[in-house]
Amino acid sequence: MPSFDVVSEVDKHELTNAVDQANRELSTRFDFKGTNASFELEGYVVTQVAPSAFQLKQMLDILRGRLSARSIDVRCMDVADPLENLGGARQKVTIKQGIEQAIAKKLIAAIKASKVKVESQINGEKLRITGKKRDDLQAVIALLRKTDVDLPLQFENFRD
């Protein structure tokens, strides 16, 4: 039976490249000259360090631009509130990986409401869709692309 997986993943290498490019842009921008502003990547968490909260907002725009230039969907970003102290300001941006349980259930409910003859099941942070016809699976892909989810969805492992 044909099947495919619905995932929400970010390529670690592309993320590293985007953060490196954002750091390079910080070093060349006039409004950040002489400041200790930087991006630091640890796992899937990007930490922004700047002298003020205003500069953090500018840095977030730089990061968004670099992520989209590296074809990473910015909906995967979970931006925390900035932390300010006398030494400067910090802000953590978490890059979301995988489909959470609540969102997976919402996607399954949307698939069932469409009355397409497919089966869907949650496999950890993935969603496996199985159907008898390839056309049904393609209809589900079109449906999932239209749904309003705050995660970028990728479709992989399409088996016939």
Swiss-Prot record:
Record has rRNA processing as a keyword: no
Gene Ontology terms: cellular component: cytosol
Disulfide-bond pairs as recorded: none
SUPFAM superfamilies: YajQ-like
A GO term, aspect molecular function: nucleotide binding
Domain of life: Bacteria
Pfam families given in the database record: DUF520
Keyword terms of this UniProt record: Nucleotide-binding
Function: Nucleotide-binding protein.
Family: Belongs to the YajQ family.
Protein name, entry field: Nucleotide-binding protein BP2916
